[in-house]
Structures are given as structure tokens and as C-alpha cells.
């Protein structure tokens, strides 16, 4: 199949990592994959399997950018594109116009729970399929009544499990070397919805109980003002955690970072899927997550991880303390979590399901 992936993202997050894995995986399977990106896109280095000549860079501010739409339509026609697949909501109307002018089929992936706007309702009726990355996202799409039941398909995000998996020996010990603390980490862009402040307050409680624990927050504040990072830094100082909690910014190699964690926490207030949760589980790191929409689909409490109520700092601190004190439980949760990821959230399963969605619309 000849497939054009469209993405105007300016930064890399979970959705962009998903796109890169999808494009590279489909290319390795023998499909002709193309990518339309904005000139400042950070994605080209991530598309390691996609031929460089298959990547086109065009401004994609909105569907009103007619010149870009016409350029992409010509590109799609000249390259005999069969499937146009868009991943960012602001790109959906543009992708719909390009698909219509080039006679290609239109596939969308929905990564978030936010309602679509009026432009989407007016332009997306002829979408062939919209992929929801979780049951929660699929339910939200149904509630908006833009797409029919036949148009909505559930395909969970998948990851390259082997890239994250590693040996678990020597990690699950109650007592490390004197100079080696236990490490609890979280990964996600700095924003109130991601729950960093709850994580910090829980860290303060745990630090009062144990001296051998340190905490790590990886991620950047994507806002122009940087206000949330400043709030986080202020809270860390107020709780006297400067020596116990590190803000390390954006990390390119997530698998390497996860290999340094003894526990992973996802304290989000809302999470449509939870790619970082799946990555941590694949890496064999026991996970504690708030019972957000996506986390409830991924984790069975006390079987493949721990779930705690959203916003309950005391419960989060208790879960962290409990797992740090019980190495046997950490090891059991880790093994079950890795098994769960291989069964349900592997890259191969995602590629199989996406290929099937493509084939269905081409029939």
C-alpha cells in the first residue's frame, strides 16, 4: 500500500512517537510510506526507516492554507497515494481536502478526549475510518455523533516491547548499596493535567519516611510562558525537596531513562491512553497510576500495577511506600505487566490492526 502520514506537530510527545513507530513499522513491512511534515518538525530523524525522498515539508497552519493543501494534493496524486492518515486534530480538515482532491481514502487517529470543533463536524463526514487509541476515546467519539459506528475502530497504541524490555535481575532488592537510592520517576510534559504537583506532594510524604529514595520528573513545559514549570519549582522549594527531587527536562531516550527507575508513577488527572505507562510496564518497571480513563484499560490493580484515586496524594504516597518496601510484590507486578504488554500492546499487534483498517477501506 502507498500511505501518506500527515502531522504538523512542532514537538514530540506520545502521539508523535506513535506516528514514528507506525511509519517505520509499515515501511519495514514493505509498504510505501510517505510523510508530510511542517518545516520545523522534529520528526524526520525519528522516521529512520522512511526514505528521505518520501518526506515532504509544507506549512500546515490550517485548512485555510489553500496553497499547502493543493501542494499536498499534487504530491499525493503524483505518488499514487492510496491512504492519507492524519494524526493531529488541526490537520484533519486539511487531510480531508487533500484526500478529496487526490481521490485517496482518509484515515484519522484520535489520541485525545477533547470534543471536536465546528470545522471538524463540517469537513469530516466522509472520513473512511477514525482510529481511537483507547476505549475511552472511542466512547467520546460516539458521544459527539460526528462519525458512524462503522467509521470508528479501536486500535490501542503499540510499542516495540523488546526495545524497552531488559533483565530484571538485581533490581528487586530492599537494600541497595549505601550510595544508591531507590528511584521513583514520572515522564510527561509539564502541565496541570499530568499531575506533577500531586507527585511532588506525595514525594514529600515518602521522603519524610525514608532517606533512601529520590524522585525524578522528566518532561518540558510546552507553554510559551513556562508558568507551570515555575509553579513546580516553587513547590519543590517550599517542600524542601531540592536534594531529593530532580527536574531533568525532555529526555530523548525514554527506554534508557526507564532503566534507571525502580518505580514509575503516572499521576495524571486525565489520560486518554497512557503510552508512558505501557513503556514502563514493558521495561519491567512497576507502575503506580491514577485511575484515569486510559490507565484503567491498561492496568489491573494489584495484578499488573497499582491504581489510586485521581488527586489523592495520601493514597499515592501510600502506594509508593508500600511498593518500595515490598520487593517481591514489585517483581511480581513487573513480570505480569511485561506479559500484559506483550499480549495487548505490542507494536506488531498495532501494525496488524492498522493494516487491516487500511485494507478494509481499499476493498
Q: What residue ranges belong to the model's regions?
A:
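N-terminal strand-loop element at the rim of the active site
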Residues: 5-70, 75, 151-154, 223, ...
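A short, well-ordered alpha-helix in the C-terminal region of glycosyltransferases
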Residues: 315, 322, 329-344, 353-356
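Short hydrophobic beta-strand element within catalytic cores of glycosyltransferases
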Residues: 36-37, 286-289, 299
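Aromatic "clamp/platform" in nucleotide-sugar-dependent glycosyltransferases that forms part
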Residues: 250, 269
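Conserved acidic donor-binding segment of nucleotide-sugar-dependent glycosyltransferases
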Residues: 301-302, 306-313, 322-328
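Acidic anion/phosphate-binding donor-loop and adjacent secondary structure
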Residues: 63-67, 139-143, 150-151, 158-175, ...
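A conserved, positively charged/aromatic
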Residues: 100-135, 139, 145-147
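A conserved mid-protein helix/loop that constitutes part of the nucleotide-sugar donor-binding site
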Residues: 13-21, 186-208, 215, 306, ...
